[in-house]
Amino acid sequence: MTLDRSFVELNRAATDRMRALAARLTDEEMRHPVGEHWTVAIVFAHLAFLDRRALYVLDATEREGKVVNPDYNIFVNDLSLPFWAAIPPRQAARLAIETAEALDRRLEAYPPDLLELIHAEYKRYVFRAYHRTEHLNEAEAALNPVATS
């Protein structure tokens, strides 16, 4: 079966539309709401993220000779890296702290029977300290390598 190659022109047209929209919008317009939680800028970030996922699948499939879908850690960590890098440092810290506080409150008040189900599936959803501590240790070691040697 021959693949319908109309995707080439459709993709190019959508990319041209994206480029034109981005070129004409002000920063204020980029912050304009799109639905309840998104903005125009988030739409662009979402498109970039999922296009990076498609690029990963194409590269890995070509390398392996079979379709390769990224596992969760690659999908989230490797593909998200350029987006995280674009967040101003203080905003990244603020987001991490606010999210940790909200999650801590939610976990503390969560229905025990459901919490046990979640813990049985993946305990690190409940014991967030494991993941937080791992990365905080890495950050502190990078900032002060002599003290950790």
Indicate residue ranges for each PLM-predicted region.
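Alpha-helical bundle segments that constitute or directly flank the non-heme di-iron/ferroxidase center
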Residues: 1-27, 49-59
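Solvent-exposed interaction patches of small proteins and small membrane subunits
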Residues: 2-9, 32, 63-69, 94
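Hydrophobic packing residues in well-ordered alpha-helices of helical domains and bundles
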Residues: 4-11, 89-96, 125-128, 132
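Positions in alpha-helical segments
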Residues: 5, 38, 42, 82, ...
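Structural signal for well-ordered, non-membrane alpha-helices
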Residues: 15-23, 51-55, 97-111, 136
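Acidic/histidine-rich alpha-helical segments that form the ligand environment
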Residues: 76-116
